[in-house]
């Protein structure tokens, strides 16, 4: 019930915020929207470098309200707000996209240590667990091997379910990013229409007409840039990260499952060997 109420709140927030952003794009004073035009009208432009003024011409508050505000608001309307917030947070994950590739070697080395202790009948200590850098591996080793909580088949299903759960969450984040990439150019067109209507309604100076025209042009530019240079690349990077992490989680699942069965370290390491990046590259070159 709490989740349902939270989703309703997020949807309501999206509608209200979207209306506020669109109305702000319409009603915000044009003289305070485009920074370069404001500097020129106030006589302050001469104190700035001409290249800086050219750059500032592309900064427009009305366009930002409509495109960015509209895109975010539509996302909260379309998706449960917790998932929407999580997708925004996932943007930071793209900067660790290469981590999973390096983590496979760490898992391989740590599996070797744990497998040797498990096979020889030695107790796995808290220090051993603390040395496991991957949180999935640490939790699975602690809960499923050290405490001997479940049987072999149940262990296999638990690990498989957790990997599937991660894949589902990653797919949801990618879906939301793809939605935002589609929505951004659409709101760019909304801003273009708003700018054209304001321009046609303008009966004052040429400067006022140019201010309205800048909104029409810049919203389209913002929508295209936000979609094609920000959101689509981030979604693509997130897909790559998902695939890398699925390989890593599958490697950990295989390792934990075999360690729990007290298989020989050599056998375990032979199975894990193909998960290492250089071995996958060799396989792709040979059979790709």
Question: PLM ranges: what are they?
Answer:
Residues 2-46, 166-240:
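Helix-termination/interfacial motifs at the ends of transmembrane alpha-helices
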Residues 1-10, 24, 28-173, 245-288:
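Large intracellular
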């Amino acid at each position: 019930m709490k989740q349902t109420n939270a989703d309703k709140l997020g949807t309501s927030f999206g509608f209200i915020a979207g209306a506020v952003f669109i109305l702000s794009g319409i009603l915000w004073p044009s003289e305070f929207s485009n920074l370069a035009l404001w500097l020129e009208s106030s006589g302050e432009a001469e104190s700035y470098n001409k290249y800086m003024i050219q750059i500032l011409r592309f900064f427009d508050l009305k366009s930002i309200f409509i495109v960015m505000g509209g895109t975010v608001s539509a996302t909260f309307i379309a998706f449960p707000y917790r998932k929407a917030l999580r997708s925004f947070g996932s943007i930071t994950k793209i900067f660790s996209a290469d981590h999973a590739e390096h983590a496979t070697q760490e898992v391989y080395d740590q599996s070797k240590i744990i497998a040797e202790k498990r096979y020889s009948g030695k107790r796995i200590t808290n220090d051993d667990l603390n040395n496991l850098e991957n949180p999935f591996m640490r939790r699975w080793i602690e809960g499923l091997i050290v405490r001997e909580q479940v049987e072999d088949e149940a262990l296999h299903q638990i690990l498989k379910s957790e990997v599937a759960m991660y894949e589902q969450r990653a797919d949801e984040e990618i879906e939301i990013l793809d939605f935002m990439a589609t929505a951004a150019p659409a709101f760019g067109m909304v801003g273009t229409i708003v700018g054209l209507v304001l321009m046609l309604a303008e009966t004052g100076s040429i400067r006022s007409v140019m201010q309205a025209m800048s909104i029409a042009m810049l919203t389209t530019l913002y929508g295209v840039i936000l979609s094609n240079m920000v959101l689509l690349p981030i979604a693509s990077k997130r897909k790559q990260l998902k695939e890398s992490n699925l390989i890593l989680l599958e490697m950990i699942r295989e390792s934990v499952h075999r360690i729990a069965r007290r298989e020989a370290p050599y056998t375990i390491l032979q199975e894990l060997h193909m998960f290492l990046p250089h071995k996958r590259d060799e396989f792709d070159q040979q059979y790709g």
